[in-house]
């Protein structure tokens, strides 16, 4: 189901970053290598989001989440909870095959395919998709032992995932929210 991508989100000291690879896979065929599966959303682009799973389903979820974010006046926590409530109530949405990561400078959430809202234990690193566990492991190690800035950490972690996961490539795109920029 989620064999099409890797998305990694990192909330560091100076900024929040989301990154994703560009590979779109259908079965055992690579359809595209330069897809964009991350976005800046919300008022002034102060929320970052990325998806893994069915593209059509993910676009529906993006639209729904943006509406929740707008209703919540860019309050990511409230929007995530409201989004989860809507997801669980709607029979059609419960069948969507997609997951999302959303983050701002305060919060980071994984929105699961069944409407769960999960904040990572460390409150700063989350990953989804077929290469998600590889990217997550690399990011945790680089965060703990490395000396990289936030964007470099995300890019290097995704590159490591692309070397292991056949559904992830090294065409990496990132979006950032910086504290002083």
Curated annotation (Swiss-Prot):
Subcellular location: Cytoplasm
EC number: 3.4.25.2
Sites where the protein binds Na(+): 162, 165, 168
Protein name in the entry: ATP-dependent protease subunit HslV
A Pfam match: Proteasome
Subunit text: A double ring-shaped homohexamer of HslV is capped on each side by a ring-shaped HslU homohexamer. The assembly of the HslU/HslV complex is dependent on binding of ATP.
Regulation of its activity: Allosterically activated by HslU binding.
PANTHER family: ATP-DEPENDENT PROTEASE SUBUNIT HSLV, METALLOPROTEASE TLDD
Membrane-spanning residues: none
InterPro entries from the UniProt entry: ATP-dep_Prtase_HsIV_su (IPR022281), Ntn_hydrolases_N (IPR029055), Proteasome_sua/b (IPR001353), Proteasome_suB-type (IPR023333)
């Amino acid at each position: 189901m989620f064999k099409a991508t890797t998305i990694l989100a990192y909330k560091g000291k100076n900024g929040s970053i989301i990154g994703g690879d560009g590979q779109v896979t259908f079965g055992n065929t690579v359809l595209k290598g330069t897809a964009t599966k991350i976005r800046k959303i919300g008022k002034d682009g102060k929320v970052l989001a990325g998806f893994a799973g069915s593209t059509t389903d993910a676009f529906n979820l993006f639209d729904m989440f943006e509406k929740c974010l707008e209703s919540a006046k860019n309050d990511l926590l409230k929007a995530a909870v409201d989004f989860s409530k809507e997801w669980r109530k709607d029979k059609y949405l419960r069948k969507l095959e997609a997951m999302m990561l959303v983050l701002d400078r305060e919060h980071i959430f994984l929105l699961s395919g069944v409407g769960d809202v999960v904040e990572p234990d460390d409150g700063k690193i989350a990953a989804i998709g077929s290469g998600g566990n590889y990217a997550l492991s690399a990011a945790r190690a680089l965060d703990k032992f490395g000396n990289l800035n936030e964007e470099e950490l995300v890019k290097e972690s995704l590159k490591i995932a692309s070397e292991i996961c056949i559904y992830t490539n090294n065409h990496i795109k990132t979006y950032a929210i910086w504290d002083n920029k």
